[in-house]
Curated annotation (Swiss-Prot):
Top EC class for this record: transferase
Sequence similarity: Belongs to the methylthiotransferase family. MiaB subfamily.
Domain (TRAM) ranges: 498-573
Chief place where the protein resides: mitochondrion
Alphabetized InterPro entries for the sequence: Elp3/MiaA/NifB-like_rSAM (IPR006638), Methylthiotransferase (IPR005839), Methylthiotransferase_CS (IPR020612), Methylthiotransferase_N (IPR013848), Methylthiotransferase_N_sf (IPR038135), MiaB_methiolase (IPR006463), rSAM (IPR007197), rSAM_horseshoe (IPR023404)
GO cellular component: cytosol; mitochondrial inner membrane; mitochondrial matrix; mitochondrion; nucleoplasm
GO MF entries: 4 iron, 4 sulfur cluster binding; metal ion binding; N6-isopentenyladenosine methylthiotransferase activity; protein-containing complex binding
Protein name: Mitochondrial tRNA methylthiotransferase CDK5RAP1
Length: 586
């Protein structure tokens, strides 16, 4: 089954017929008067006439509807798919054109970039890090806040100049928008920026070779339909940084939480999990490549539930944290996150495991027990609070009160002594009063996070807040409150990080410090940056051998100073996770 058949099947289930018509027209009708010379020398008119001829004899609209109504198996890999009837196999090939990828936003977008590149690489495209030599520029975008989108609009204005200066002797420069912004602003992008050739939503990356082939005929092309089952489970992401020591492994996509402020369910679709077997296979391959850290990734990572294996389809139920509720009917059965975390941690004892981003409602004791017991699961938890006011949390539809959140924090710290905590906060949400703000300030002081991500509220269309609430906190008040939260966070983080001074910590070396070529930089268990001098030290596995630590090495570092974001220390020796876990680090 080729990509369009899957696309229309998903559309039949999730959107009105008019949207389907729009995408079909957007994909196949000419919207761009720019000529597109064929690399073999055919005229623009000849290419378009040939394309139109084959399109006329290709599938009809009714053909797509019939195909969409018949359940079909997804192919095991994108290579086995037949080309659409209106395109030849050769037209789906990249012909060694060079692709430049720019990534904005969250770590999911970093992983999406690796998935998109894996697909394009198999179609014959080449990767370039030089913007000037690119034939195709793809921006992997974010829509979580207005500022993120404005960054992309500004970037498009810069690329418009580059496209206009393109020498006629070269193939036309193609520009595409991928990811959440393509999903949210599809119509506006195509109408406002005629220089954008291609749009692909988060669930349409398999379709990139076809979309680029359509673009080569001189048209704009778009596929922004969300899927109910796409997880890219069969695609091995290509690491964009060959020297990296860590990698992100996407275990699920989409989100069902429907928090009132959040655009994610509308840009990334419903929650669906990858089969456990495919995740374990990817982690094994990363281990074989020598990577030393894997972060399991998802919008709501700890609500993972794999129902792909029949024998687990009717067992188990939702196990929410005490005092927490959901905005949706929890799925039943399947292999849960605790099972996945257990299996991943067994693959390579020398590979550190992290996960993000979780929801506080999904922290059963079996997950906490695994974190406590397994030496290679980092003792660090991201616990997004968003606000310290129960009234604001209710308006946000977070499913918990301040009291329930604080109780969970205490429970986690009892279960995992010394655990590092990080969190997200939004200030200036609809209806937030000064008292609500002060309650958030007090929560920051009470919990004392190691790391924090704090933002002023930015209303997003389609969200529940957009339709039912009023963005009534003035911008200057939002910014003032944000500055206050940042100040308090730094004060408290400095205090909690100062307790590490005098301790010896296991650090995974990432490379040289950005500020000094004589210092190395790495991260500890709590995911804090640790800076230490590049010096010869003993290798604990080979006494007497003097070595210099390299990226991917584990070293013991004695902490001598701390700030709100960074620890500094002296390197003691090179070690392994196993050896360090057998010794008490103090």
């Amino acid at each position: 089954m080729h990509p369009l058949q899957r696309v229309f099947r998903a559309q039949r289930l999730s959107a009105p017929l008019t949207s389907m018509c729009w995408v079909l027209l957007r994909t196949f009708r000419a919207h761009n008067s720019t000529s597109c010379p064929d690399p073999e020398g055919k005229s623009s008119e000849g290419v378009q006439k040939d394309f139109s001829s084959r399109l006329a004899t290709g599938p009809t609209f009714q053909h797509f509807l019939r195909s969409a109504s018949v359940p079909q198996e997804k192919p095991s890999s994108p290579e086995v798919e037949d080309p659409p009837p209106y395109l030849s196999g050769d037209e789906l090939l990249g012909r060694q054109r060079k692709v430049y990828l720019e990534t904005y936003g969250c770590q999911m977008n970093v992983n999406d970039t690796e998935i998109a590149w894996s697909i394009l690489q198999k179609s014959g495209y080449l990767r370039t890090s030089n913007l000037q030599e690119a034939d195709v520029i793809l921006l992997v975008t974010c829509s979580i806040r207005e500022k993120a989108e404005q960054t992309i609009w500004n970037r498009l204005h810069q690329l418009k100049v580059l496209k206009a200066k393109r020498p006629r002797s070269r193939v036309p420069l193609r520009i595409g928008i991928l990811g959440c912004m393509a999903e949210r602003l599809k119509g506006e992008i195509l109408n406002r920026e005629k220089m954008v050739d291609l749009l692909a939503g988060p669930d349409a990356y398999r379709d990139l070779p076809r979309l680029l082939a359509v673009v080569e005929s001189g048209q704009q092309a778009a596929n922004v339909l969300l899927s109910l089952d796409e997880t890219y489970a069969d695609i091995m992401p290509v690491q964009t940084s060959p020297s990296a020591t860590s990698a992100f492994v996407s275990i699920m996509r989409g989100c069902d939480n429907m928090c009132s402020y959040c655009i994610v369910p509308f840009t990334r679709g419903r929650e669906r999990s990858r089969p456990v077997a495919s995740i374990l296979d990817e982690v094994r391959k990363l281990s074989e490549q020598g990577l030393k850290e894997v972060t399991l990734l998802g919008q709501n990572v700890n609500s993972f539930r794999d129902n792909s294996e029949v024998q687990f389809s009717s067992t188990g139920s939702a196990n929410l944290s005490r005092g927490f509720t959901t905005n949706y009917k929890p799925k039943q059965g399947g292999l849960r996150f605790s099972h996945l975390l257990d299996q991943v941690s067994r693959i390579d004892p020398e590979m550190r495991i992290r996960f993000t981003s979780p929801h506080p409602k999904d922290f059963p004791d079996e997950v906490l027990q695994l974190i406590r017991e397994r030496h290679n699961i980092c003792k660090q938890i991201h616990l997004p609070a968003q606000s310290g006011s129960s009234r604001v949390l209710e308006a946000m539809r977070r499913g918990y009160s301040r009291e329930a959140y604080v109780a969970l924090v205490h429970h986690i710290r009892e279960a995992i002594p010394g655990v590092g905590l990080s969190s997200d906060f939004i200030t200036g949400f609809c209806g937030e009063t000064e008292d609500d703000h002060l309650q958030t300030v007090s929560l920051l002081r009470e919990v004392q996070y190691n790391t924090g991500f704090l933002f002023a509220y930015s209303m997003r269309q389609k969200t529940r807040a957009y339709h039912r609430l009023k963005d009534d906190v003035p911008e200057e008040v939002k910014l003032r409150r944000l500055e206050e939260l940042i100040t308090v966070f730094r004060e408290e983080a400095s205090k909690v990080n100062a307790t590490s001074v005098g301790c010896t910590q296991l650090v995974l070396v990432e490379g040289f410090s950005k500020r000094s070529t004589t210092d190395l930089c790495g991260r500890n268990d709590a995911n804090l940056k640790v800076i230490f001098p590049d010096a010869e030290v003993e290798d604990i596995t080979d006494p007497g051998l003097k070595v210099r630590a390299q990226p991917g090495d584990y070293v013991l570092v004695k902490i001598i100073s701390a700030s709100s974001q960074t620890l500094k220390g002296h390197i003691l020796c090179r070690t392994t996770m196993k050896d360090s876990s057998m010794n008490c680090l103090t």
